[in-house]
């Protein structure tokens, strides 16, 4: 707290649920809590931040630019990938990126169908039986995992693994895929790059 106060910031950006927020505000420091979970949240928070920094409209323009880049990326996707099923696994093992999450929105924007549909939470815990039954055409995870999908019992029958359609994103790059913010077009680009290197479905 003391170090933050010493810097005399105009505003502190924070995630919700931190007690430090109240302490900073009691010391007269403005705190902006950001908690984007969807594209709609990100668009709104970017403009709130831009307005706070004295640049109203800049957040909206940035969001539009990102969407334009996303449209270009989708056009670069081989048509064979359109409508194919994807399983996107997060850091925590069997936790998936659901369709309702911003990651799910990115996958949908690229024309992929998420096996963790809208009837599930944003980040559902999927059992191995669920994934095997859903039979995704492609699997996306970080590169270094304790037990990667190809080594999981019973997963060898999944179409993605039978056909070598498994995206292993380097851990250093995976962060851009799973954190909401102005890097969503970068995340989409990384997914497209990986898919273009895999055998076509």
Where are these regions (language model features)?
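Proline-aspartate-enriched helix->loop->beta-strand connector
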Residues: 1-17, 29, 127-144
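Flexible loop/hinge segments that line or gate small-molecule binding clefts
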Residues: 15-52
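His/Asp/Glu-enriched short active-site or ligand-binding loop at hydrolase and phosphoryl-transfer sites
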Residues: 100-123, 143, 168-170
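Structured C-terminal subdomain patch of bacterial secreted/periplasmic proteins
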Residues: 43-51, 60, 138, 142-201
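Short beta-strand->loop
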Residues: 13-16, 33-37, 88-100, 169-170
